[in-house]
A protein has these predicted regions:
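The feature encodes the CheY-like receiver
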Residues: 14, 55-56, 65, 74, ...
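Charged docking surfaces used in two-component/phosphorelay signaling
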Residues: 15-23
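C-terminal output helix
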Residues: 106-115
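Short hydrophobic/Thr-rich beta-strand motif most characteristic of the beta2 strand and flanking loop
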Residues: 25-32, 40
Length: 122
């Protein structure tokens, strides 16, 4: 089963991601603390990351850069899912290494298409 790591400090959001990812046949790895994300990722080796941006340190921008510095995650797709709907945040996230940027609230089909598209590229 394909592992997808979700890092979001909002427990309601991670519960929703757990439900929708399992329904699509993925194995979600859920974290509400970004500080643990890199160490857990090295153990679990997810095929894709879904990150929120607005989290306590490290925030999603910094976490994205941290993941890209790790050799095993240089090419792992990262999808940002955030309430920040401004061009500057989008530019910074893509510059930090994100592959896609979805804004909350998002449509489930939008998320599914992004996940499938990025996993097919691997």
């Amino acid at each position: 089963m394909t592992k997808i790591m979700v890092v979001d400090d909002d427990k309601d959001a991670t519960s929703l991601f757990e439900e929708v990812l399992k329904a699509e046949g993925y194995e979600p790895i859920l974290l509400n603390e970004s500080v643990k994300a890199v160490s857990v990722a090295k153990k679990e080796l997810p095929a894709l990351f879904i990150l929120d941006l607005m989290m306590p340190e490290p925030d999603g921008f910094k976490l994205c850069r941290m993941l890209r510095k790790e050799p095993e995650f240089r090419n792992t797709p990262i999808i940002i899912v955030t309430a920040l709907n401004d061009t500057d945040s989008r530019i910074v996230a893509i510059g930090a290494g994100a592959n896609d940027y979805l804004t909350k609230p998002f449509r489930l089909d939008e998320l599914y298409v992004s996940i499938k598209d990025h996993l097919e590229d691997l």
